C-alpha cells in the first residue's frame, strides 16, 4: 500500500466519523440499550453456537427478561394478551400470564383451556 492510499483511507474514516451525530440522545434514539441489543442479536441471528447448553439456557432467560421490559421490542417480536394488553416475549410466559392473572378473574374456566384464542402473535421483525 502506498502512503497516499493510507492517507486517503484515513481521511475517509475521519470524514465519516465527523459527520456522525455525537450527542447521547441521538445515539439512544437509534439503538436499544446495549444488553438488550446484544441479546436480541444473538437470538435473532442464531449466533449462539459457541455457547454450552447451560450458557444458552441462561442467555435465553436473560433475553426474555430484558426484552419483556422493553414495550417496543415486545410489540415487534413478542406476544400480546388480547384481554388486558400486557406483553410477554415468549409463548410460555404468555400462557402463564393468562392462567395466573386471568384464570377465574375475567376468562372463564372452560375458555382457559383454549389459551391460543387470547394470544395475539406479533412478528413484524426479522
Swiss-Prot record:
Instruction: Give induction info.
Output: Expressed during multiple stages of host plant infection, including the prepenetration, early biotrophy, late biotrophy, transition and necrotrophy.
Q: Can you tell which superkingdom this protein's organism belongs to?
A: Eukaryota
> What InterPro entries does this protein map onto?
Znf_C2H2_type (IPR013087)
Keyword Iron-sulfur found: no
Q: What is this protein called?
A: Host transcription reprogramming factor 3
Annotated GO MF terms: zinc ion binding
Chain positions of all zinc fingers (C2H2-type)? 79-102
Source organism of the structure: Pyricularia oryzae (strain 70-15 / ATCC MYA-4617 / FGSC 8958) (Rice blast fungus)
Q: Name one cellular component (GO) term.
A: host cell nucleus
Amino acid at each position: 500500500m502506498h502512503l497516499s492510499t493510507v492517507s486517503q483511507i484515513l481521511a475517509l474514516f475521519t470524514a465519516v466519523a465527523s459527520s456522525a451525530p455525537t450527542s447521547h440522545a441521538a445515539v439512544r434514539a437509534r439503538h436499544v440499550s446495549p444488553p438488550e441489543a446484544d441479546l436480541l442479536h444473538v437470538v435473532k441471528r442464531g449466533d449462539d453456537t459457541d455457547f454450552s447448553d447451560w450458557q444458552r439456557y441462561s442467555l435465553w432467560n436473560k433475553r426474555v427478561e430484558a426484552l419483556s421490559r422493553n414495550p417496543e421490542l415486545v410489540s415487534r417480536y413478542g406476544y400480546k394478551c388480547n384481554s388486558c394488553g400486557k406483553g410477554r416475549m415468549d409463548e410460555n410466559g404468555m400462557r402463564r400470564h393468562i392462567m395466573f392473572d386471568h384464570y377465574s378473574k375475567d376468562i372463564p374456566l372452560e375458555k382457559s383451556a383454549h389459551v391460543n384464542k387470547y394470544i395475539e402473535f406479533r412478528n413484524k421483525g426479522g
